[in-house]
Amino acid sequence: MSLLRCRFQALPSLCFCVLVLACIVACQLQMPPGTQSPPPEPKSHWSQVQSKVKELVEPLVTKTRERWQWLWGPGPFQGFLQTYYHDHLKDLGPRTKAWLRSSKDGLLNKAQSLCPRLLCGDKDQD
């Protein structure tokens, strides 16, 4: 049972490592076409692991980028901003003024109720 618990605790770390590797591969794939790649290094165990991970992750990154390309276009983002503005920000000025006015009135009423009658006087005398 404890072995199973250890596996579940290690899962977020593993997912994070895979995500970092995917980002690295994606950044390497986005190099401009005229740039030269670094000279090949002698094959070590680590470079073999790196190349194998790159070979496995590269298709996933490419597919994900192609599937989510519509989200980064100007249409959906602009539509989201317009909807957000109309829903939340369009009448922000009048709402803010009304809130400030009611807050000011509330604070003045509290201050007058706390003020001793000798200093502030009675309201009935005005």
Curated annotation (Swiss-Prot):
Keywords: Lipid transport, Secreted, Signal, Transport. The keyword Signal applies. It is found in: Secreted. One of its GO terms (cellular component) is very-low-density lipoprotein particle. InterPro entries: APOC4. The keyword Transport applies. GO terms for biological process: lipid storage; lipid transport; positive regulation of triglyceride storage; triglyceride homeostasis. Residues 1-27 form the signal peptide. May participate in lipoprotein metabolism. Belongs to the apolipoprotein C4 family. This is Apolipoprotein C-IV.
